[in-house]
Amino acid sequence: MKLTCMVIVAVLFLTANTFVTADDSGNGLENLFSKAHHEIKNPEASNLNKRCIPFLHPCTFFFPDCCNSICAQFICL
């Protein structure tokens, strides 16, 4: 029972985190393909190259994207 509750909470947290951190959520899918085409022409314009979290900024345990450190207690150390 406790494990089921923990799994439900984890799924809800990850779902909320996905919606909060989604890029360009206001436009939906209307500019998805044009943006992808632009990023193929110019790979340096891709947002994937710029997604690391600096030192002492908030991070998540499940998706630790710290630049040169680790995520401990929800802060990049």
Curated annotation (Swiss-Prot):
Keyword Secreted among UniProt keywords: yes
Protein's cellular compartments: Secreted
Signal sequence annotation: 1-22
GO cellular component annotations of the record: extracellular region
Pfam families from the UniProt entry: Conotoxin
Organism superkingdom: Eukaryota
Principal location: secreted
Keywords associated with the record: Cleavage on pair of basic residues, Disulfide bond, Ion channel impairing toxin, Knottin, Neurotoxin, Secreted, Signal, Toxin
Pro-sequence residue ranges: 23-51
Free-text tissue specificity from the UniProt record: Expressed by the venom duct.
Domains: entry comment: The presence of a 'disulfide through disulfide knot' structurally defines this protein as a knottin. The cysteine framework is VI/VII (C-C-CC-C-C).
Protein name: Conotoxin Vc6c
Lineage: Eukaryota, Metazoa, Spiralia, Lophotrochozoa, Mollusca
